[in-house]
Amino acid sequence: MLHRYLPMTEEDKKEMLQTIGVQTIDELFSDIPESVRFKGDLKIKEAKSEPELLKELSQIASKNANLKEYASFLGAGVYDHYAPVIVDHVISRSEFYTAYTPYQPEISQGELQAIFEFQTMICELTGMDVANSSMYDGGTALAEAAMLAAGHTRKKKILVSSAVHPESRAVLETYAKGQHLEVVEINHKDGVTDLDVLQSEVDDTVACVIVQYPNFFGQVEKLADIEKIVHQQKSLFIVSSNPLSLGALTPPGKFGADIVIGDAQPFGIPTQFGGPHCGYFATTKAFMRKIPGRLVGQTVDSDGKRGFVLTLQAREQHIRRDKATSNICSNQALNALAASVAMTALGKQGVKEMARQNISKAQYAKRQFEAKGFTVTFAGPFFNEFVVDCKRPVKEVNDALLQKNIIGGYDLGRDYKEHENHMLVAVTELRTKEEIDTLVNEMGAIQ
């Protein structure tokens, strides 16, 4: 073997050449004229040994602002949360790490049970009846929810709050274009969905209304008031929710939500650039046969022992591709497992305590900003994010903070012209009092 990763011997080459009727490599390429063949050595560096390569890659990676050396106040959909050490241990086990869709239940009970437990925990958090095995991420889960609503109601108009994550709204627009659906944005007022505008837009042509809870600005939407407006015209009520926040907030299911979706990233999934993430999708029983993605159910075998299987598979593309509820094939099962392990390790009280710490530390940060003379833009209740008026370009502020080993908040001016110079600050349970005080003092010094 000439190369550790290319297990081809000289005997292998000889056998392959003989099979196609040539004796040498030169004879194989004889139809290429000598005049156009490359001669000499390529102008690239010589190969490195594994230790040399690891050293060089580590040096390159060290240029990044990483969460081991920087205090992060950046959220906007991806958060720096505590992940129990056991998470990586469990998801690294080969029976989980390399598993694919468990079509054969007799040899996939471990994987199926893990998915079933994920579904169960999502239902408990959201207050819904049924949850699927996961989606790609929160954005695609939101778009799939809108597609379900349009198909169920046979209506073409989708109302979405402008306080929903901008990237999720962009994914929705992409899905809607292919299905010839109309997406109408409902403006926000004082950091939450403008209910007067919503009331004026909801009519018998609306398939669904989509809001986020807490919303993109961190504010807690008034779901009870929104639900009354939405269901007046028998439209579906879709709520995108941070699952960790539901350890403290009343779950959307208690407010009459028809579909609850979101991203399980806060539970055991690191803040890696670009993902992967783990979307979740939960509904009432009324939509059980229309929910996209895999569903795992509990049953008993011929001996009466508990077992787990993929259920209601007639909805899926490997059974009826042309009539499938969705053509999502593989899901984020490994990340769903990570979320399940994290939630299990934390336990109910741990999830509640984690949510409580997010609230209390974010409230402390808000008070410190106000004491320093900053304006916190919205006055409503929030979870772990709030908006600060920087009075200058947020990029300038963040560039200065990076010099102090601080990753600043999200620049809202990128998505909302009316919020130029405003920073969305995220404060999770991992931030210390000292880190919060340093952030406020450094921003005060460059105000």
From Swiss-Prot:
The organism's place on the tree of life at top rank: Bacteria
Position of the signal peptide: none
Catalytic reaction list: N(6)-[(R)-lipoyl]-L-lysyl-[glycine-cleavage complex H protein] + glycine + H(+) = N(6)-[(R)-S(8)-aminomethyldihydrolipoyl]-L-lysyl-[glycine-cleavage complex H protein] + CO2
GO process terms (BP): glycine decarboxylation via glycine cleavage system; nucleoside metabolic process
Keyword field: Oxidoreductase
Entry EC number(s): 1.4.4.2
Pfam families: GDC-P
Any one GO molecular-function label of the UniProt entry: glycine dehydrogenase (decarboxylating) activity
NCBIfam families assigned to the protein according to its UniProt record, in alphabetical order: PRK00451.1
Subunit annotation: The glycine cleavage system is composed of four proteins: P, T, L and H. In this organism, the P 'protein' is a heterodimer of two subunits.
Similarity comment text for this entry: Belongs to the GcvP family. N-terminal subunit subfamily.
Function: The glycine cleavage system catalyzes the degradation of glycine. The P protein binds the alpha-amino group of glycine through its pyridoxal phosphate cofactor; CO(2) is released and the remaining methylamine moiety is then transferred to the lipoamide cofactor of the H protein.
Protein name: Probable glycine dehydrogenase (decarboxylating) subunit 1
